[in-house]
Amino acid sequence: MKELYLIDALNIIFRNYHVMKNYPLLNTQGENVNAFIGFFKTLFFIIKEKNPEHLIITFDSEVPTFRKQKYPSYKATRDLPPDDLIPQIGWIKEGLLKAKIPIFEMEGYEADDLLASFAKKAAKNNYLTYIISPDKDLLQTMSEYVKILKIENNSFIEMDNEYVTKKFGVNSFQIKDYLAIVGDRSDNIPGIKGIGAKGAANLLREFKTLDGIYSNLEIINKKHRELLIKEKENAFLSYELVSLEENLKIPEIENFALKNFSEEIISLFEKHSAIALIKTYKKDILKQEKENADQKSLFKQEPTTNSLDDINTIDTENVKYRSITTKIELDDLIESLKKAKYISIDTETSSLDTYTAKLIGISISFKEFEGYYIPIEAKGKIYIEKNYIIQKFNNLFESNPKIIGQNYKFDYKILKNNGFNPIPPYFDTMIAAYLIDTNSKVSLDFLAEKYLMHKNIKYEDVIQKNDNFANISLEMATSYSSEDADITFRLFNIFTKKLKEDKLDKLMHEIEMPFNKVIIEMEENGIYLDKEYLKEYGKELGKELEAIENEIIKSIGIDFNLNSPKQMHEILFEKLNLKLPEKMKKDSTDIKVLESLREQHESIENLIKYRQIAKLKSTYTDNLIELINYKTNRLHTSFIQTKTATGRITSINPNLQNIPIKDEKGRKIRKAFKPENGNIFISADYSQIELAILAHLSQDEVLIKAFENNKDIHTETASKLFKIEEKEITPNLRRIAKSINFGIIYRMSDFRLAKELGITKEEAKGFINSYFDSYPKIKEFIINQINFVRNAGYSETILKRRRYIKEINSNNYLERSAAERIAINSIIQGSAADIMKIAMVKVFNEFKSKKMESKILLQVHDEMLIESPIEEENEVKKILKIMMETAYTLNLPLRANIETGKSWGEIH
């Protein structure tokens, strides 16, 4: 029997648009292509898996349908398609026409009507029809010759009568009657109000059809009878609306044979940066001949008695993954790697702790769709001695190959701590993905699906809970690990082109990858922590907490657990009967809630103080000691290069960037961080770098002159705002000016500024206006920057780092305002981050070139912390001053402040 496949285009389009809505794929013009790429990915999957002889892709009519004419409220509650989706529908139609893939639409009818009519006509002509859509309306077309399929997790699920009965409680032939009763909220079909899914199923089980129900009203229970009588008109109207038109005048099925695909669509894929689609189209759709020469050895060499056995090769239609289990095979592989232009490396380990993890295996790829796995251990079996593998890889690393990795920082440390001498990566796909879209996820699984339309083998599908990678079969280990290396290599090729298209390749290779080398070493350096000092300070905080707790209990008159949110809630809102301000979470007792209650009871101030001290104690004095590495006796944080949208790095496990500095308690915690072996800490930070960048970008002569004259910018601003001499500026006036200076960077509203300064909204508005009068070009810069982002869709730092801000054109005022704040902040904070990275790379390289023992330990926003031998102190200060102040040329001087101390707490 001949087969026909019918596809509901808009269903696939909308589904793909929304599934990636928060992580949009963008072409080189900054346009969203989620739906475009997702649609063709799905279509090519269908064609590859089903190989249909006849296929029709249907679209809704662009003019109102007969249902809209009959019932004007039909689909009236639906939102209009998003602005960035509408053009994608046009591109999809254009692509289908270019590829010569049959499409069909008819004025006045929906795609579902076309599908129903084609299905009926096909059945009459002895076709077996498959409709691919999850739409429940189409279930009414089901028959012996018409099957309904939906796609889930890369597989086809038939929605047969058993499926319908289980999901809706009725048979497929009753779907129209069922929908007439329950209605359809998405289409605004009324149905019978008051009768739900369960009631509808029960009625149809007994009376079979809608007509059958109305013919037996006298024996139906009173409640349902009254509803049925009241809603009769809506019931039969709904029946008409859900009934699909099966008798439209449509062309013959033979006109829709799927053949003679055209390559014209490839130019459209190139235009919209759909590189993976081009490969899929050529390989799976055009059915080009694939290279299938019989390889006589692992690397197309002459056959030898030591070539890899077939049993160690995993061949599928698309990939070739192999395990390396003999010394000869490893020698062969290493020699080939020495000739390779790029090498992707991934490691498998016993844990994620890079200091204690055992290396289980290494995977390699240097050609797309190929991968090689070298097991250190598999199922308790040792194939090649570890020392031999180390020797061979160290020999490879000496040739300085270009290493590719996905978060290779982890693999580098694993290799190093397992006896290898690895070299830093040439390219990291995680960093590249982050640069291409700072708002996107960057995990390998996500990137594979996003850019390659490929679902990776899941780790949890390979490793059982609490099991170890060393315990799985060699075949499974080879498949899983080789795939990671292969996917990373494929992503590298895509990202290399994408970075060049987006003009991000310079940022990648001249800043981010050299900086990656710096943070690898920073993580290895770690920082010494005085455990005894921290323990004693923890005891001191504990005593202070106990005293505050006693005061609170005495004030309230009830003994309760201050660390129990439930008990705290009962005390505050039931015992003390405090009133929670509007818009506050009713069940919350977090710090914001407590601050809002400050004026209502004398104990609230102490509760806030208790919370703050308890957090310091649990986060730092209690926790940091537990994180000290027993091998190095130092604390090793992890720096994340791909987290913030502005380009700043973050510190985790533990977060050393959030230790308070403005209060005495935070400074005391910092005092626990000390140099070792008689060394000294040297700190360097930029003086007002964000305001310096604002002056540079805005070209405001007044602000530039203030920097050139090395003036205190906040005092200068206060003088202009309050129109008094600088010598008359009080600390409070300077504080106001400082808030306004940074408020401008963060696009602070007059309302928020008023709240921060404790003044009226009118006064705050006056300060902002006065500020722009004093620095006129700053206002002009802000307006121009927002307009640039509106047109381009992204902000851009001075070094071309992009941040896509789609909400900048939102119709929602709050969304748009937030996007405007992000637009200004991103260019300033992002540019500061860029300059700091350049400076750190220069300092790092200078230390290396001079073979100095000094090392960079931490970076906290605009500050760099160095541990240095006393004898190198002056040289380090000189290097920091020169390298930081010449990192990037602005239209005004960059200035670095240098301080020293015997602990981190002594600095600042």
Curated annotation (Swiss-Prot):
Gene3D superfamilies: 3.30.70.370, 5' to 3' exonuclease, C-terminal subdomain, 5'-nuclease, Ribonuclease H-like superfamily/Ribonuclease H, Taq DNA Polymerase, Chain T, domain 4. Transmembrane segments: none annotated. It is an enzyme of class 2 (transferase). One of its GO terms (molecular function) is DNA-directed DNA polymerase activity. SUPFAM superfamilies: 5' to 3' exonuclease, C-terminal subdomain, DNA/RNA polymerases, PIN domain-like, Ribonuclease H-like. CDD domains: DNA_pol_A_pol_I_C, DNA_polA_I_Ecoli_like_exo, H3TH_53EXO, PIN_53EXO. Its EC number is 2.7.7.7. Keywords: DNA damage, DNA repair, DNA replication, DNA-binding, DNA-directed DNA polymerase, Exonuclease, Hydrolase, Nuclease, Nucleotidyltransferase, Transferase. In addition to polymerase activity, this DNA polymerase exhibits 3'-5' and 5'-3' exonuclease activity. Belongs to the DNA polymerase type-A family. This is DNA polymerase I. It comes from Borreliella burgdorferi (strain ATCC 35210 / DSM 4680 / CIP 102532 / B31).
